[in-house]
UniProtKB/Swiss-Prot annotation:
Keyword Transmembrane helix in record: yes
Keywords: Glycoprotein, Membrane, Transmembrane, Transmembrane helix
Tissue: Most abundant in squamous epithelia.
Organism: Oryctolagus cuniculus
Glycosylation sites: 35, 43
Topology relative to the membrane: Multi-pass membrane protein
Subcellular location: Membrane
InterPro entries: EMP_1 (IPR003932), PMP-22/EMP/MP20-like (IPR050579), PMP22/EMP/MP20/Claudin (IPR004031), PMP22_EMP_MP20 (IPR004032)
Regions crossing the membrane: 1-21, 67-87, 95-115, 137-157
Pfam families documented for this protein: PMP22_Claudin (PF00822)
Domain of life: Eukaryota
Name under which the protein is recorded: Epithelial membrane protein 1
Length: 160
């Protein structure tokens, strides 16, 4: 049981770190023809990330930014709640609050990544002729899977 809790804790920390990286890094879509990438915040060309996004004023992008930031917040809150429950909760109880908070994080990642996929990652809306998904986009979807698994495991596990 202790090994399982430690493994879940490590995956939860990895999820928090990957959420930070995927939200902050400007590599959601990468151009195949030129050395350029686009993120949630900036457009990077040849290593220079000083240019803003041409569609930065759109509500869909602002929603993606908001949901990704909310997912980070809920993931960190869930981690703090888990550590608190680990030391204060009576034996035999389940980690309901940690699990519920992590599932809210999962929902925020789902909404944010889905909006970005629909609006910007299909190739029609970005400024590149040929492009592919960057590591930030892929990390966001990996965090989607991890946060769901961690949230469900928190709901199922009991403290022994």
């Amino acid at each position: 049981m202790l090994v399982l809790l430690a493994a879940i804790f490590v995956v939860h920390i990895a999820t928090c770190v990957m959420l930070f990286v995927s939200t902050i890094a400007n590599v959601w879509v990468v151009s195949d023809s030129i050395n350029a990438s686009v993120g949630l915040w900036r457009n990077c060309t040849s290593g220079d990330c000083s240019g803003g996004l041409s569609y930065g004023h759109e509500d869909a992008l602002k929603a993606v930014q908001a949901f990704m930031i909310l997912s980070i917040i809920f993931s960190v809150i869930s981690l703090i709640i888990f550590v608190f429950q680990l030391f204060t909760m009576e034996k035999g109880n389940r980690f309901f609050l940690s699990g519920a908070t992590m599932l809210v994080c999962w929902l925020c990642v789902l909404i944010g990544a889905s909006i970005y996929t629909h609006r910007y990652a299909n190739g029609d809306s970005n400024t590149f002729d040929r492009s592919h998904h960057g590591y930030s986009f892929i990390l966001a979807w990996i965090c989607f899977c991890f946060s769901f698994v961690v949230g469900v495991l928190y709901l199922v596990l009991r403290k022994k």
